[in-house]
Amino acid sequence: MIILPAIDIIDGQAVRLYQGDYNKKEVVANDIFNIAKEFECLGAEYIHLVDLDGAKSGYCVNEKIILKLAQTVDVPIEVGGGIRNFETIEKLIENGISRVILGTIAMEDEGLLKKAIECYGEKISVGIDCKNGYVYGRGWLAESKLNYLDFAKNMESLGVKSIIVTDISKDGTLEGPNFDMLMKLKKLVNIDITASGGIRDIENIKELKNIDIYGAITGKAIYSGNLSLKEAIDITR
């Protein structure tokens, strides 16, 4: 299992939200480049980057910062948030982003998703952001009528090789991941699963490793000092 430290961006700053609520924003750092370099120095194998402005606005608001960051560190970066056309997918990947995360578009435009997979294969991941069993889009602000298990199975059938699963109600809470949700997905699909939302401490990391998923995304636990990124990386390598 790999550990993906998270950097969520609003107005060019690294922030954390509570349960996806934009009104409950906490700035954790003004310089995202320093954070990324620190993650690199601690041995991060991947960095998870989210353009929260983009997720809300529907286009890649912080694109310049994201592309500059890709040139700043020698660690693969995955990016999500507001990526809703092929041109943006193409630009990000052609300029050094290792993996692009599609959420809203995966729900609303299967044709575009298929085209992205045909062109870029495993560089395309789908974000499944859910609450009460249903998938949300548009920056976690719009509930769909899609059950997360049905959606995951459909994504697998379309050729998606990896999914990032977030329980919105857990995000930023330090309450621990939704293991029940992850186990149901693990039994249902045969694709890479990355867990996001609620990771509290090193014990959670050990538990996630034991269920044998691809990755774990953690932000608040690192920024709050609850979790040592280096220790998490060391025990999962």
Curated annotation (Swiss-Prot):
GO terms for molecular function: 1-(5-phosphoribosyl)-5-[(5-phosphoribosylamino)methylideneamino]imidazole-4-carboxamide isomerase activity. Keywords: Amino-acid biosynthesis, Cytoplasm, Histidine biosynthesis, Isomerase. Pathway: Amino-acid biosynthesis; L-histidine biosynthesis; L-histidine from 5-phospho-alpha-D-ribose 1-diphosphate: step 4/9. Its EC number is 5.3.1.16. Gene3D superfamilies: Aldolase class I. It is an enzyme of class 5 (isomerase). One of its GO terms (biological process) is L-tryptophan biosynthetic process. It is found in: Cytoplasm. It comes from the Bacteria. One of its GO terms (cellular component) is cytoplasm. Coiled coil: none annotated. InterPro entries: Aldolase_TIM, His_biosynth, HisA_bact_arch, Isoase_HisA-like, Isoase_HisA-like_bact, RibuloseP-bd_barrel. CDD domains: HisA (cd04732). It catalyses: 1-(5-phospho-beta-D-ribosyl)-5-[(5-phospho-beta-D-ribosylamino)methylideneamino]imidazole-4-carboxamide = 5-[(5-phospho-1-deoxy-D-ribulos-1-ylimino)methylamino]-1-(5-phospho-beta-D-ribosyl)imidazole-4-carboxamide. Belongs to the HisA/HisF family. This is 1-(5-phosphoribosyl)-5-[(5-phosphoribosylamino)methylideneamino] imidazole-4-carboxamide isomerase.
